[in-house]
Amino acid sequence: MQPMPLKKRRFYFYVLSLVFFLAIPALIFYESGYRLGDSFNFVKTGGIYIYSPESGSEIYLNGDKIEETGFFLKDFFVDDLKPGKYSVLISKEKFWPWAKNVTIKEGMVAEAIAFLIPKDPEGETVPKNIEEANPAETETSGKTATTKKKPEANPEYLRILSLFEEEKINKEKVVKSNTLAKNPADESPATSSPEKTEEYIYEKVSPRGKVGLWREGNQILAKWLKSDRSLPYYFCEGNNENCREIIAIFNSASVVRSLDFYPGRDDVVVIAVENGIFAIEIDSRKTQNFQPIYKGVDPYFIIDGNTFYVKDKDAIIKIKI
């Protein structure tokens, strides 16, 4: 085999050297998080942080399954994403799906924190009365006669009923105070209070004390109670842009009968409206997820820990989430 001519070797050397030196900047750009954009210009990539509270949830990005959450690992970070719009879908069998459209900007990380509500949550009716397991028996002429005792009120039913009464009184006080704060001219001198300020009284405060809720008519509003510098993404539009301390969460055509935070969440609110109880997220990026918890006739609710107590007409239902 004859050796390659010197001229040819030099040619290959120069070509390969040129390729090598051209590739170095491209590799540096790539390692620094830059990619070739749609307009053939270099753009810095971003990422998205995704969290699902339920283990066994399937996470989809633009229709492609990218992860399934485990018992301990419930969050996932996707990096090296070109700027643009992405759709996130999180689903789990027997739960309502959660979806969100997220915009990724250059060098920014977007957040998508889901909530998943069971389609058929466990529930049981709290009886009004304690039924006698064994009715009293007396012997009459060799025959057994059964005597029924007067039904005894169920203490648990009465306790829960009193909680609903307390909730109703508290709501009426808050609504009245906020109405007067908004329209001080409506307050008569006899009912005026020297300690009253223009600040609203919050009907509910989130579990971690970060968000306050109140209503104006049928509109639900939320206020961030911590430092303005720490406003979370769900008080902002897009990637922490146009952030506001006070935002409107929901505007109902019907009366909102009950209002509270979803257990353990600062960013999910539960409302009773029309014939149902629903969870709605504060995050208004499309789509603002709205998931049913209970459907009945005319329900009210209170929350104790992770238990929902629903009062629908005379019935009280205990629902575990």
Where are the regions a protein language model picked out?
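Hydrophobic beta-strand positions that form the internal "hydrophobic ladder"
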Residues: 212, 268-269, 308
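Loop/turn residues immediately N-terminal
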Residues: 55, 95, 217-220, 274-278, ...
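Predominantly a core beta-strand signature of beta-propeller blades
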Residues: 127-130, 229-230, 285-290
